[in-house]
Amino acid sequence: MKKTIFNSVAFGIIALAILGCKKETEAPQSTTGTATVEGYIKYNRNLRNDTLPDGSYALIREGIPTSVTLTFTLDSYDLDKNPDPSYNYDIIQKVVTVDASGHYSVTLPTPNSSNTIYGELLISDFEYNPIITSSQNTDSLAARVVVSGPSLPFSIYKGGKTILDHNF
């Protein structure tokens, strides 16, 4: 009887030790991928430099001021594999600036599938004094100009690169 109880207890301890061990689980896969949006935002600041030496016209644009912000907006509803219409999803916003040449680049989240999602780029307002030709044929500054940035739609997909340029 003692042997039977001892064997049962020993068997129970061994079974518990084997079944109680947990396998190390792998880290869960990311639920989102990424995509890159990049491009140039430019404007025509120097209205005098549009005439070439031979008298022909060529519009020459420059990068917008580096203080201008670019706000990229996505709806996180689009990132969910099985979105719940009754859930209030967050709006994702990423803000970047341009370099001196007007170039920007931003990495945004995408669904972890090949689905394309849509977003919006908003360029903040900025002001400048355009360079014009005076009556003495020299550079002079015109009155202040305020530029209001439009809202630009874009599309992205996992692993993709979207080029989005804009000229004022």
Regions found by a protein language model. Name each.
Residues 105-119:
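Short Pro-Gly-centered beta-turn/loop motif in secreted/extracellular proteins
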Residues 39, 97-109:
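Glycine-centered loop-to-beta-strand initiation motif
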Residues 82-93, 144-148:
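Short beta-strand and strand-turn-strand segments in soluble, beta-rich domains
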Residues 125-162:
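Structured interaction patches on ligand/partner-binding surfaces of diverse proteins
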Residues 5, 16-46:
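Bacterial Sec-dependent N-terminal signal peptides
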Residues 46-89:
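Short, ordered, surface-exposed loop/turn motifs in non-cytosolic proteins
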Residues 1-9:
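Bacterial N-terminal signal peptides that target proteins for export
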